[in-house]
């Protein structure tokens, strides 16, 4: 049976009357049964998806919640309030292929009222507990994949409860594929202390780590744009050569001469034990080297003892001849500098791998971060800060669609402040118990105003607040015109043009006819009445703005009245609304066919 035929049959089983959940699970399991590596579970129906098959979301701004920075080049961040399947669907229209980094911290499905499905908490003894969680995640990750740029990366925090299931599901070709898997980070989020000590003494292997699954959409494994470093308390005694002013001596000899009263035996322990040795290394790091083999430099000719500095492939090598062959000197300074540990140490360091240690130390202060209360749900700012520092560019767009307390935005704004970046962040969260406004938004506002952060105000940031609103997919001509107006805020988000202009090419704007948004570098106009197109075309021809112009033009078809724009059509980007919106949602989540539903 072909996959398409199988999918249709499964859909009929799901909607058939007279079957209970066990019957459906058995039938679907029989259809899916095959000898292959992968995962089979019953895809559980979800109310949010069913709503989206009959309705389509738009984004509506709440302008009274906007925070505008005085800084002219301040990045604009976005908070979207709404069920995150609705928010993600809207983002497939505004940001498909535009998101560089996704970080999410989804519910771990502990059974302790952390995961709701169809408005009900999923209990630990629910037979479909894992199926519901996987169904929930697959729908959202499928949309997330559409949002990632070609070299985009997603980080997914998870515990051991669903790690194995999530890994197999993400490895499937329906989502990211095994070739896109980068690695799994092991994050030390707790220590064996307190109540865990008794459990450990009784023989229990206590849990200290959580996991972060990493996938790169394009399959690129080298996702670290910036290296992270952990402090190294011991000294590598291979770094035993002291080279200065052409004179080669030993580190032992030079340290003894500088600090004759210090008594020691093993150099490997000396860095940890002796503040004098740490001071000596810091002051002389430019002159300390290790001897190592080297290949690929047969074109270099040196006399015995001669040292030459060679630049190759963007890297500096210190080559010398020991009388038999070429060797290299490895500088200690490449392993010395500021570290990314909890203490923000400076000294000997090693490049961090997949073991991210000591984040349990941050947990003692995490409740104070952002100056909001969010029980058992916050991740440390330092954790997400370092993920972004490692993997993002300074102009990256970052998404978190399980925003919770808003740590991702807080971390991103801090990183921008530290490295001069202009990253933009989009947060999505629901409005359950007022979380979006009372916690997520409040924390962002606090951070911008300098409350609940380690290093003061983050005022050079602007913030816009949107909510999702559902509109019927079945459109009468009047409803289509209404949708074009209702979707205006979503078009602003799509084009990243937010400041409303009172004029467009010398014409006064009118909310019933045309609205215009832009910042001087580009303009977006939304035309609601086709009668004014000749006047708009004439204004464009007369003014010939030197910035890019996008015109969203109401049209009952997919033709944005191109012929009426005449000669200026080639100077602007013309898009018909609402067709461009409806077509996008139909590709992402086809509308429910009421006739077929009734027949099934």
Predicted segments with their positions:
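SAM-dependent methyltransferase catalytic-core segment centered on the flexible catalytic loop
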Residues: 67-70, 82-85, 89-153, 161, ...
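PRPP-dependent phosphoribosyltransferase catalytic core
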Residues: 414, 418-600
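Conserved Class I SAM-dependent methyltransferase catalytic core
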Residues: 130-186, 441-448
């Amino acid at each position: 049976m072909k996959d398409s035929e199988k999918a249709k049959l499964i859909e009929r089983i799901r909607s058939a009357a007279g079957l209970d959940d066990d019957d459906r699970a058995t039938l679907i399991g029989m259809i899916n049964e095959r000898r292959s590596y992968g995962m089979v579970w019953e895809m559980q129906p979800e109310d949010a998806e069913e709503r989206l098959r009959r309705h389509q979301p738009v984004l509506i701004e709440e302008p009274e919640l906007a925070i505008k920075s005085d800084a002219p080049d301040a990045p604009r961040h976005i908070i979207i309030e709404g069920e995150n399947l609705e928010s993600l669907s809207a983002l497939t229209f505004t940001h498909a292929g535009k998101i560089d980094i996704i970080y999410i911290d989804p519910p771990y499905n502990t059974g302790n009222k952390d995961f709701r499905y169809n408005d009900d908490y999923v209990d630990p003894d629910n037979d479909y507990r894992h199926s519901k969680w996987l169904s929930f995640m697959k729908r959202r990750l499928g949309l997330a994949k559409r949002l990632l740029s070609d070299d985009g990366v997603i980080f997914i925090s998870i515990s051991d409860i669903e790690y194995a299931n999530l890994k197999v599901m993400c490895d499937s070709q329906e989502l990211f594929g095994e070739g896109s898997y980068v690695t799994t980070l092991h994050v030390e989020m707790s220590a064996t202390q307190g109540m865990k000590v008794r459990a450990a003494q009784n023989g229990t292997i206590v849990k200290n780590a959580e996991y972060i699954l990493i996938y790169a959409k394009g399959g690129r494994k080298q996702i670290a744009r910036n290296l992270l470093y952990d402090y190294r308390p011991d000294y590598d005694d291979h770094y035993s050569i002291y080279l200065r002013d052409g004179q080669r001596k030993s580190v032992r000899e030079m340290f003894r001469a500088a600090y004759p009263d210090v008594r020691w035996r093993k150099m490997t322990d000396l860095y940890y034990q002796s503040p004098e040795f740490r001071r000596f290394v810091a002051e002389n790091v430019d002159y300390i080297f290790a001897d190592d083999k080297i290949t690929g430099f047969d074109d270099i000719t040196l006399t015995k003892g001669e040292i030459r500095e060679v630049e190759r492939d963007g890297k500096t090598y210190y080559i010398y001849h020991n009388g038999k062959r070429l060797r290299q000197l490895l500088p200690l300074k490449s392993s010395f500098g500021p570290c990314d540990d909890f203490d923000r140490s400076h000294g000997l360091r090693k490049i961090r791998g997949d073991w991210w240690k000591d984040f349990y130390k941050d947990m003692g202060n995490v409740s104070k971060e952002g100056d909001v209360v969010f029980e058992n749900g916050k991740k440390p700012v330092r954790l997400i800060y370092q993920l972004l520092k490692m993997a993002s560019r300074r102009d990256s767009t970052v998404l978190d669609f399980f925003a919770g307390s808003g740590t991702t935005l807080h971390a991103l704004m801090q990183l921008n402040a530290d490295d001069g970046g202009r990253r933009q962040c989009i947060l999505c969260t629901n409005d359950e118990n007022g979380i979006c406004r009372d916690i997520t938004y409040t924390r962002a506002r606090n951070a911008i105003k300098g409350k609940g952060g380690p290093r003061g105000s983050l005022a050079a940031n602007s913030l816009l607040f949107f909510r999702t609103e559902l509109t019927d997919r079945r459109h009468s001509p009047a409803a289509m015109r209404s949708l074009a107006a209702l979707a205006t805020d979503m078009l602003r988000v799509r084009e990243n043009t937010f400041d409303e202009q009172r004029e467009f090419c010398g014409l006064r704007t009118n909310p019933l006819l045309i609205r215009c948004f832009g910042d001087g570098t580009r303009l977006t106009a939304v035309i609601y009445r086709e009668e004014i197109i000749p006047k708009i075309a004439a204004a464009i021809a007369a003014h010939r703005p030197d910035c890019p112009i996008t015109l969203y033009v109401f049209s009952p078809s997919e033709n944005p009245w191109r012929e009426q724009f005449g000669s200026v059509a080639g100077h602007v980007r013309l898009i018909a609304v609402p067709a461009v919106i409806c077509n996008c949602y139909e590709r992402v989540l086809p509308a429910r066919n009421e006739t077929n539903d009734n027949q099934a």
